[in-house]
Amino acid sequence: MAVTVETLDKLERRITLTLSADELKNEVESRLKKLARTTKADGFRPGKVPMSVVAQRYGYSVQYEVMNDKVGQAFAAATGEAQLRVAGTPRITEKDGSADGQVSFDATFEVYPEVTIGDLSALEVERVTTEVTDVAIDRTLDILRKQRRTFADRPQGEYAVDGDRVTIDFEGKIDGETFQGGKAEAFQFILGEGRMLEAFEKAVRGMKTGESKTFPLAFPADYHGADVAGKEADFLVTLTRIEAQNLPEVDAAFAESLGIADATVDGLRADIKKNLEREVKFRVAARNKQSVMSALEKVATFDLPKALVDNEMARLVENARADLKQRGIADADKAPIPTEMFQPQAERRVRLGLTMAELVRANALSATMEQIKAHIDEMAQSYEKPEEVVRWYFGDQQRLSEVEAVVIEANVANFVLGQAQVVDKQLPFDELMGA
């Protein structure tokens, strides 16, 4: 069939769809007859309800359904004939003055842009690498020891020091009034681990069991408790118990308690290094991928379909609402979230998505099943029962699709790094893990 396409804007198009009125009428009658076989109505046997009753009950909804189906089919056929890649959902409006026996509609829609990728060899992309050092292994060992430490009461008269578990009663007042969350009994925390404000810990450090102390404390302006943020309180603290920590020795017994196959100190350190290297690999890949994505924005300039940007903005708003709900914000569903605030982020995501899709298409960068399985196997190694994790991923197509997307992004990143001017940078372990 001949399809006439009007260009309304850079990406906006319009086509006219013409349907046969008789064809629409016949389809409506056919569907109503099918419904009549199962329609029930008082005073009539099943399947014997008059067509006039069936039409009165279902006529409007069936007409709407048929019109939607036929217009959708005609639109798909017309855009396929014209070889148009439709972005978003078309706006359909009925035209006046159609010829006898016909019903005409205008379909207005956007098409995907022609994505042209610039010279990748002109890009400068930073690629980081990170080594797992003995210092990082030692720090992990310290964490493991603390997870398995025990505590014992300090002798009467000894001072509280960092690493001790202290039990206190406290009451804080602002302008002479106790504030919410400012009073507790038998409250425990470990000195020096940053659970409490530094000024609070400093006051408790050096106290003895049974000792009481009063001191002022200024809450930071960005303190998570909005009622006290930026205010000064007066605290009364009584220290009721001090327990010194006992850290296990790093020896074969400690390695065995952790389930290390090679239950030696060297075996334990090797196992820690392997796990840290796995985590470093994922973090380095994520950081390098981000560098690639930022660079790609410089070589991909094209118009964006408004429909895709609008859809992405709506998705980001829903994500923001979900985040508010998770934080326990009341009436998160009704919270006024301006859609426009997400427009720059949505435009960037759409642009990157279209750019990556073109790179994947033009350079055969789709994920293979071997790559997907290898990625899942590698992730599973950080769990106690890797085989169960693998089965969990392969048991759901949505989860597999998520892994596939990650692998495709990695393929694109590696391809771009192979084409661009790469600036290698050694990133300290702490900086990578703190990112």
Swiss-Prot record:
PROSITE patterns, per the entry: FKBP_PPIASE (PS50059)
Entry GO MF terms: peptidyl-prolyl cis-trans isomerase activity; protein folding chaperone; ribosome binding
UniProt keyword annotation of Cytoplasm present: yes
Keywords assigned: Cell cycle, Cell division, Chaperone, Cytoplasm, Isomerase, Rotamase
EC number of this enzyme: 5.2.1.8
GO cellular component, one term: cytoplasm
GO biological process: 'de novo' cotranslational protein folding; cell division; chaperone-mediated protein folding; protein transport; protein unfolding
Domain PPIase FKBP-type, chain residue ranges per copy: 163-248
Catalytic activity: [protein]-peptidylproline (omega=180) = [protein]-peptidylproline (omega=0)
Matching SUPFAM superfamilies: FKBP-like (SSF54534), Triger factor/SurA peptide-binding domain-like (SSF109998), Trigger factor ribosome-binding domain (SSF102735)
Subcellular localization(s) per the UniProt record: Cytoplasm
Gene3D superfamilies assigned to the protein according to its UniProt record, in alphabetical order: 3.10.50.40, Trigger factor ribosome-binding domain, Trigger factor, C-terminal domain
Enzyme class per UniProt: isomerase
Similarity remark: Belongs to the FKBP-type PPIase family. Tig subfamily.
Function: Involved in protein export. Acts as a chaperone by maintaining the newly synthesized protein in an open conformation. Functions as a peptidyl-prolyl cis-trans isomerase.
Domain comment quoted from the record: Consists of 3 domains; the N-terminus binds the ribosome, the middle domain has PPIase activity, while the C-terminus has intrinsic chaperone activity on its own.
Protein name: Trigger factor
Native source species: Leptothrix cholodnii (strain ATCC 51168 / LMG 8142 / SP-6)
Classification lineage: Bacteria, Pseudomonadati, Pseudomonadota, Betaproteobacteria, Burkholderiales
